[in-house]
Amino acid sequence: MEPVGPVLPLFSLENQGFPVFFSQGTEAEVLQRRSMGNGQFIQLPVPKGPHSVGCTDIMAGHTKEGSFFRLYYPCDPEEGEKPPWIPRYEYYQGLAEYLKRSRRWFASLLNMAFGDCKVPATWNARFKANETYPVIVFSHGLGAFRDESASTTYYFESLPKPTEHDPTSKPQKTSSTSSSPPPSPSPSSPGSSLQEKWLPYRKVEGEEFEMRNRQVGQRVDECVHALQVLEDLNNGHNVDNVLEGGFDLSMLKGWMDLHRATIVGHSFGGATAIQALAKDTRFRCAVVLDGWMLPLTDETCSQVQKPIFLINSEKFQTQDSKERIERLCSQNSQSRVITIKGSVHQSHTDFTFLTLKPLNVVFEIKGTIDSMLGLDITNHAMLAFLQRQLDLQKDFNKWDDLVEGLGEHLVPRPAPSQAGP
């Protein structure tokens, strides 16, 4: 079982005082990375906040009912190995199948394009026990994986773990003794009692709603379970990590502010965030990045009474989805929705920074808005919203205008209709 959605656990957010948030870095760093011409990035943006970033993988139980996620957290500054953005070759094969391309040649092409890309976080770095940190659970989209939105979220554990019943998952591990980042002992190593099982991508024929609705319920359960694992760790309970990683989970005891837990998701993960907000009262609010509304029932949407912030791209939402989003927002006076000009559905993912021109022509992964600018707008708007909802003692309210839909790079909201005389 493999993470299917990010669980952004631990610890706060972006830059100005929050631990992480992969953002653009200095102008010199940005220019240095534009070595492929036409402003194309060949690696992910580096963090620019006050905290260095560490990460580790956690598998609490190795069955379908277990939790498998990546945890990003504030760490002490140190040199160390950076995990690969795409951890195993099987992921390239899964991406190829999801994109309806040749598993053989297109996977090799993806490997050549992205094989050297690293996540800008230090593997198994020592946790920075400096203050209690809010917790974010992040859930990614279909055909994605735990690193797919590293640059767009704060800290997260990429949680979701597709099972045989997840028709959209690319190959995933159902059990393993090796973590995905830096090389580690394989399940076939002496003394290992577990075996890997990769789940091939399954296409959905015909009407999608029934399958996707079941699937989003499973993803919600996984996010809730991951949050429970974090709560257990925070309370000092022993959590047996099946993976051999070397990170001391006991260091996390008492440092997570679970009274300030929220859930964030992109696309299908956005639908997950909406349903999770209705299901688990521990989540105080949700942020939805271009959420895919199809898997959700109207009944589920009507149960969401807490604040929700939807950040949409310009081209993805249908008219029906827009109407459902408006009804969803009307259920809480603190809920908001904004649309970023020139953005596309993948603008909220790492692919927008890494995609070469030929791939973008075919798959429209980059919008007309500069990728770094789009990331900054998303990050700043999220931080301003979260400061409101989580009572953060920061200065993120300087971006409140973005939450209200005001800014040159936001699509103006239509004026409310005026009643007749």
Predicted ranges, named:
Residues F21-V135, D391:
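Domain-level recognition of soluble alpha/beta enzyme cores
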Residues Y73, F138-L142, S267, S313:
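Glycine-rich His-Gly loop
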